[in-house]
Amino acid sequence: MFLVRDIMYCKPGNARPMVQKFQALSKLLQQMGMGSMRVMTDVSAERYWTVVAETDVKSLEEFTEMSRTASARKEFQDVMKGYHDLIDQGRREIYMLET
């Protein structure tokens, strides 16, 4: 099992719109049978206006296929349209779950 964590450092005032995009994306992934995401905002973090989305996957191959399948769908493209305007930068972390 792996945990995939997408960390977005939003521009001031844009954390809520990014949360809404991740929430809509989570619903879309659930409809596609791909599980749900945990969406979090910072209380205290490295930077203000941080939004984190986490997904558990069985394998990196599953994650790669899930990403390809979702990103090819118009619904996904509509949900994520304009998200670059909301963020300064972002990064992805992938962890192997040991327990």
PLM-predicted stretches and their roles:
Residues 39-43:
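Short, solvent-exposed loop/turn elements at beta->coil junctions and helix N-caps
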Residues 3-8:
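Active-site-flanking beta-strand signature of metal-NTP-handling nucleotidyl enzymes
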Residues 44, 84-88, 99:
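Short proline/glycine- and acidic-rich turn/helix-capping motifs at secondary-structure junctions
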Residues 1-2, 99:
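Absolute protein N-terminus
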Residues 20-38, 54-93:
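An amphipathic, aromatic/His-enriched active-site/gating alpha helix that lines ligand/cofactor pockets
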Residues 9-20:
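Short, surface-exposed ligand-recognition loops at beta-strand->loop->(often short) alpha-helix junctions
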Residues 45-49:
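Short acidic/glycine-enriched loop/turn segments that link adjacent beta-strands
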Residues 11-13, 58-60, 97:
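Short coil/turn motifs at secondary-structure junctions
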